C-alpha cells in the first residue's frame, strides 16, 4: 500500500500565483459603487443604456410579470412569450430570419460553433478570436486552423486545402481587443466560393456599426443563407444574455443540438425585458451609434492613436504589463476608469490600455478624459 500523499492537492496554486505576480499578470476584483465616482471609459455599455430609465423599467416590468428566474431550461419551463417576442424583434432589427436566446454571449458562441461544426468538419478561426470562440473550437471536435489576424488569403488557403465536406469560418465583426473591423465582404466571398458557413460574432458591432444594426448589416450580408451571427445583450443593449441569429433552420437545429441551450436555465426574464427595452431605445434614437464613434475619435486623438477608430474600442499599446497596470492605476487615481489588457487576453508584448467610448459622454466628461489621459501618458515618457 502506498503511503498517503502529505501535500495538499492545491499546493501547486501557490507556485502559479507567484509566477503570475512575477510576470505582472495577477488579477484582482475591484467592485464599483452603485453610483459611479469616476468617469467610466472601461465598460462595454457603449450606448449608455444600462442606466436608461426605459431599460430599467423594462427589466422591472418583466421581473414582476414573469418572476426572478426562468425556472428551468427553455425546453422545460424556462420559455416565455417574452423570450420569443424579443428573439423575433432582435432578428428583425439585424435583418436575420430568426433568433435564439442564450444565457450569455459566451454560451451563444459555444452553442453556435459546436452545434454547426463537429467531428469531420473544418473550423477556420481568426488568431484574435475571443476566448469563447477559442473554447468553442476546442469543444467542436472539428479540425481547427487558426489564421493570422484578418488574413483573408490564409482563410482561402485553409478552405482550398481541406478534405472535409463541411467547413465553418469564424470571426468577430469588431475585434474586442484592438477594435479593428473584420473584412466581412471578402471573407463571405471566400466562404461562398468554397461552400463554407460564416459565423460572425457581433458582440462589439451591434449598436455601433451599421447605424446600430451591426457590421453584418452594414456589409450587406444580413439575411444571407450562409451567414450566422452571434451577439451579446450585455454591451450595447446594457443587459445580459446572448443570441444566435440567422436562418430559421439554424434556430431549429440549435434547439435540438446546442448543449449550452438544452442544458442551461433560460435567460432571466428581467434581462430579456431590459434588453427588449434597450432595443426599443436604439430604434427610436439611432443617433447613439454615431455618437459612440465620434467620442471614440476624440479619445483616440487624445491618446495619439494613429488610425481613427472604427468602433467604440480605442487600444493604446504600451507593451509591458507592469507599465499598463501602472498607467491604468494612475488614470483611476485621476478619476478615470480605463481597461487594462494583458496576456493571455492579448499577445505577449502588447499589454495595453483599452478605452471604450459611450454615446452618453458629454463635453465636460470628454474634457476630464482629455486632461487625465494626457497627463498619464506624458508621464510614461
Curated annotation (Swiss-Prot):
It comes from the Bacteria. Its cofactor is pyridoxal 5'-phosphate. One of its GO terms (biological process) is biotin biosynthetic process. PROSITE patterns: AA_TRANSFER_CLASS_2. One of its GO terms (molecular function) is 8-amino-7-oxononanoate synthase activity. Catalyzes the decarboxylative condensation of pimeloyl-[acyl-carrier protein] and L-alanine to produce 8-amino-7-oxononanoate (AON), [acyl-carrier protein], and carbon dioxide. Belongs to the class-II pyridoxal-phosphate-dependent aminotransferase family. BioF subfamily. This is 8-amino-7-oxononanoate synthase. It comes from Mycolicibacterium paratuberculosis (strain ATCC BAA-968 / K-10) (Mycobacterium paratuberculosis).
